[in-house]
Design a protein with these regions (language model features):
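Glycine-rich phosphate/diphosphate-binding loop of Rossmann-like nucleotide-binding domains
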Residues: 17-59, 258-260
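Proline/glycine-rich low-complexity loops and linkers
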Residues: 67-73, 77, 94-191
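Glycine-rich beta-strand-to-loop/alpha-helix junction loops that act as flexible
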Residues: 27-29, 84-92, 169-170, 249, ...
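Glycine-rich oxoanion-binding loops at beta->alpha junctions
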Residues: 45, 49-74, 110-151, 336-374
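Short alpha-helical segments enriched in small residues
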Residues: 255-441
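Accessory alpha-helical/coil subdomains and C-terminal extensions
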Residues: 159-240, 245-247, 257-262
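A short, flexible N-terminal coil/short beta segment enriched in small residues
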Residues: 12-35, 299-303, 307-312, 320
Length: 441
């Protein structure tokens, strides 16, 4: 944060803490026409809940100045913290700065600290600012400039009426870094200035499952929450599994008791879900698998067909994965399976490329060629075409060879479009590997 103006944070102190309410405004026409999903608001809601700030409303507007102005006029009537994401780039449709200035009656002006920060960032990339990028240094008068540690577009915050407006870039990585480094300290100060946050911030624990339908997870957790307990149980299904959440309900009168209750309920979730539970918090399946491979000193090789390298991509997104991922082969055609993995052509002719026999041969083949501890394979029909009555779209076989001479294979029947089937196939393959690793403990 650059030279914060303490007047931005000053609010009359009260005898009891007042709950801070928030609204998020996601800006971008692509969010309204199916081009992109709004992941920023989910991240913001999670971070705000940790502070005890309740998100009451969420708006999504296109790249139209007047629409943004209208959204701000609505938000200021019902929220004390307004966080906007998007519209701070260098192109003509990036008009958040102009919209905030128009709505609040502030003038736009080029700020030295914003220009210097942007110029320094571009210089690191071997570039100089063009006319469009110079617009990113325009900041409403009276606003505090928020530094962007990873991108070129600075953010800003300013007081308008009884609300604090915070404007951040829409690029998720930039927004998240700025939220953590610039905005959260600002909001903590905001809470102190108004007499403190509610006594107990909203606490949320998240659990990730795979292999059970949402209805099955619900059945396992029936009766877990005592009647009248100040905790909500939530579930959200996705191609990656079912997410289960425990969330405390707003301001609590006995925080220690509620923390103890939440921990007791969390233990209940773990006990009831057992091995179906693969991670908690922000952990992903690929991170969990990576830790288990590292713990055992094992190295993996992959042979992928219908997933097209997705499993390898996910695993290598984790820093340090070179310690346990040796190689991956995308063997889409029958010829590739034979030439690269040594799968016998007559085996493919007899059982078909999508079969448990070929999945096993693929896993054994990649493991033997890589000379590693584990070979993991996947073959299937992702669709939309290629299915038959006997082998429909969504049929997937996964193979694992751990060097015992008896490879493991498992059949799945997934539903959804091509992308969903690929995602579920990659998750299922990693889950089979996870369970195999746990058995070796």
């Amino acid at each position: 944060m650059t030279n914060p103006d303490c007047s931005l944070l000053s609010m009359p102190k009260t005898s009891a803490p007042l709950p801070l309410t928030a609204e998020t405004i996601a800006i971008g026409t692509e969010l309204l026409i199916g081009g992109r999903s709004d992941s920023n608001s989910l991240f913001l809601a999670d971070e705000l809940c940790k502070l005890g700030i309740t998100v009451r409303f969420k708006s999504v507007v296109g790249d139209e100045r007047q629409d943004i102005v209208t959204a701000l006029h609505s938000a200021v009537k019902r929220a004390r913290v307004i966080i906007m994401t998007g519209g701070l780039g260098p192109t003509v449709d990036d008009c958040t700065r102009e919209a905030v200035a128009q709505a609040t009656g502030h003038r736009l002006g080029r700020r030295k600290e914003a220009l210097e920060g942007m110029t320094a960032r571009l210089a690191q990339w071997g570039r100089r600012p063009n006319t469009g990028q110079l617009r990113q240094a325009l900041i409403p008068s009276g606003a505090v400039v928020l530094k962007n540690p990873v991108g070129s577009a600075p953010g800003f915050c300013l007081r308008w009426k009884k609300a604090l407006i915070i404007s951040l870039p829409g690029v998720p990585r930039e927004m998240e870094e700025m939220m953590c480094q610039e905005v959260l300290p600002l909001l903590r100060a905001e809470g102190l200035a108004s007499g403190g946050f509610p006594r107990e911030p909203i606490v949320r624990q998240v659990f990730h499952t795979f292999g059970l339908a949402e209805a099955d997870v619900d059945a396992k957790l029936q009766g877990l929450i005592p009647k009248g307990a100040p905790v909500d149980l939530g579930m959200l299904a996705s191609p990656m599994g079912v997410l289960v959440s425990l969330t405390t309900k707003g301001r609590q009168s006995a925080p220690d008791n509620n923390r103890h209750l939440l921990q007791t309920l969390a233990d209940g979730v773990r006990s009831r879900l057992g091995d179906w539970l693969f991670a908690e918090g922000r952990d992903t399946m690929e991170e969990v698998v990576g830790r288990e491979l590292t713990k055992r000193g094992l190295v993996l090789a992959l042979a992928e067909s219908c997933t097209g390298g997705l499993i390898g991509h996910r695993l290598t997104q984790v820093a340090g994965s070179s310690a346990y991922v040796d190689r991956g082969a995308v063997c889409y055609s029958n010829r590739a399976k034979t030439e690269m993995l040594g799968v016998p052509a007559d085996l493919i002719d007899q059982y078909g490329a999508v079969s448990k026999e070929v999945a096993a041969a693929m896993a054994c083949g990649i493991r033997a060629r890589a000379k590693v501890a584990v070979g993991l394979s996947v073959t299937g029909i992702a669709g939309p075409g290629g299915g038959t009555d006997k082998k429909p779209v969504g049929l997937v076989y996964i193979g694992l060879d751990g060097g015992t001479g008896q490879p493991i294979t498992q059949e799945f029947r997934f539903h959804g479009d091509r992308n969903v089937i690929k995602q579920r196939s990659s998750q299922a393959a990693l889950d089979i590997l996870r369970r195999w690793l746990l058995e070796k403990a």
